[in-house]
Amino acid sequence: MNASTISETTEIIQNNLDYTLFSWSKQKGIDPIAVKYGEGVYLYDYDGKRYIDFSSGLMNVNIGHGDQRITDAVVRQMQQISYVTPGCVTKARGDLGKKLAEICPGDLNKAFFTVCGATAIENAIKLARLYTGRHKILTRYQSYHGSSNGAMAAGGDPRKFSVDAQQAPNFIHFDLPHLYRWEYGEENLLKEAVASLERIIAYEGPANIAAVLLEGESGSSGCLHYPKGYLAKVRNICNQHGILLIMDEVMSGFGRTGKWFGFQNHDIVPDMIAMAKGLTCGYLPFGCLMVSDKIAAKYDDAMLPLGLTYSAHPVACAAAVETLKIYEDDNLIENAAEMGRYLEEQVELLKQQHTSIGDYRNTGLLGCIELVKNRATKEPMAPFNAKPDEMAVMNNVAAKIKELGMYTFVRWSYIFIAPPLCVTREQINEGLAIISEAITIADGYTK
């Protein structure tokens, strides 16, 4: 690193701090990594330091960074046409719709293309209400569905508290207890969770409820697993009352859990799927809402009241077509399942070394380590929706992780482990060695 490099890095960081806003952050005191380029599971800053990316950006860069095949596909499309109105069609749009229909189960054969995950969720909510003529949407506490107004109201994440007074109406939340802290066994948890949902539906009036919206697998709330058989029960309840089931696969979709979609681990078929992140792996902003033939048929002779200027953007569609091809060509979904099993084995070994590791929850390569102060009481190292002074230990752990050359998502008492699907055993070992060293800080606060 020389003086010119330091000067360049400082200028890049300062321009970003001076002229841009950072999401979910206090704007003072931010210390971002100035990323120059990425390759596979690694990011490189302007000083030449390498970071292993153990959260795939924000759980979206599933194929890894810097894949030239996506660049080439984007260039080819831009050399033909970069934009057409959604009223026109392109080869990329049709190819993508056809491929998505092939990989989605059941009769989920129609795609409405959006610009991100939140817009996929917003349009799912809108369409569910229009299709059913009902107004209420049921969602889970401790969930996240995006940061737009409707998506944030739908979520059960505490980041919405600051805008609760202005939130979109008619979202009803229900609780699903956390298995790690449930004292009465998984079978009883399933019974209680199902009974609770049935009570809420009865209290709210089933004829008022348009849809139940759930994540395919829990992500940023802490990878909180559904009890075995839960989603099948929810599917049956929805069928009984004419309620639609919407699965949010924005984070858990596209191989992240070892299957194309997280809900496929539960052997169900929803009525709609919201997707984004892994659809283009962050190479371009893009999203999609897949709907059943039954829902789509309602609009054969009636106007579909959905629209976006950038819907079915040709360049984004081309990137998505190539991305889906890479999943298959590189066997990434199979690798996610295999590496997920390997991670389970290795974290179990880490538990023997670190008294602060309370639990590890994953499905494929969507997982997190939960740190605790006491394994017997399961007191978390930082509480739910922790205040700044309650995050001191975890902030020190996060700082050490970054110092040692890792980028990952640390939230409350969770350290997320969600590397790109191309990750190898050797790279997992490299990443876990960094996490292990950082966790020694937390070990000092156990009792």
What would you call each of these model-derived segments?
Residues 2-447:
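Conserved N-terminal phosphate-binding loop of PLP-dependent enzymes in the Aspartate aminotransferase
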